[in-house]
Amino acid sequence: MDAIKKKMLAMKMEKENAVDRAEQNEQKLRDTEEQKAKIEEDLNNLQKKCANLENDFDNVNEQLQEAMAKLETSEKRVTEMEQEVSGTTRKITLLEEDLERNEERLQTATERLEEASKAADESERGARVLESRSLADDERIDQLEAQLKEAKYIAEDAERKYDEAARKLAITEVDLERAEARLEAAEAKILELEEELKVVGNNMKSLEISEQEASQREDSYEETIRDLTQRLKDAENRATEAERTVSKLQKEVDRLEDELLAEKEKYKAISDELDQTFAELAGY
């Protein structure tokens, strides 16, 4: 009887242990199911993040392509402006040569004017000797003296205008040098943007290394694109300013050419008057 009781007690204890183990296994099963659900949720979130990262990568890549296209357009504009500046520089060189030639003509005209003045002085002495001549001769001498005075005034005025033209040409050269400096700065900025774009391209290749690193770099890429876009706008603004400067220089060159043409015509008129004066003086 005692053996049966002991056996029943052992069976009861074994039953209780089995129940405890069953409850523990059920709890472990519930914990495992919860962990599985959490892992599945984390996996879904990770897949969504990966999809978002792929979309962000596509957007960043598209912005990069747009920045490269704008950069190429800016390079073309800078090349065109360099060609315009080169042509303007050539015109200014020709203008300087023309000014030098006109300065030589001015010197020649001045020398001839001095000779005419000496001849006028001789005419005055001759007029005093020939005071007995007719009133018509006196009026002719007065007319010649007035023409000589007018010729002197025209020559002095032409000399002042040439000095003014030379001063404006110097100012134009300074503006041209500034425009060239701006173009060089724009070209240097474009080279800098190209290097930064290369760096961005290399960084993008490592975007897929890990989800954490890609998420950390996303903000940096967007900031880099905004910075590149701003710098590209700055380069375009500088290029626009350089275009306005080139246009202004071209207008100044055209105006100087018109002034030179007018001065040439005045000099021709002075030369014709001097020739006529010499011819008239020779007649006395």
Curated annotation (Swiss-Prot):
Matching InterPro entries, A to Z?
Answer: Tropomyosin
Identify the domain of life: Eukaryota
What GO molecular function terms would the record report? Answer: protein homodimerization activity
* UniProt keyword Coiled coil, yes or no: yes
Coiled-coil regions listed = 1-273
What keywords appear on the UniProt entry? Allergen, Coiled coil, Muscle protein, Repeat
Name any Gene Ontology BP term.
regulation of muscle contraction
Subunit (UniProt):
Homodimer.
> What information about domains appears in the record's comments?
The molecule is in a coiled coil structure that is formed by 2 polypeptide chains. The sequence exhibits a prominent seven-residues periodicity.
Family of the protein in this entry? Belongs to the tropomyosin family.
What this protein is reported to do is described as: Tropomyosin, in association with the troponin complex, plays a central role in the calcium dependent regulation of muscle contraction.
Protein name, as recorded: Tropomyosin
Lineage per the UniProt record: Eukaryota, Metazoa, Spiralia, Lophotrochozoa, Mollusca
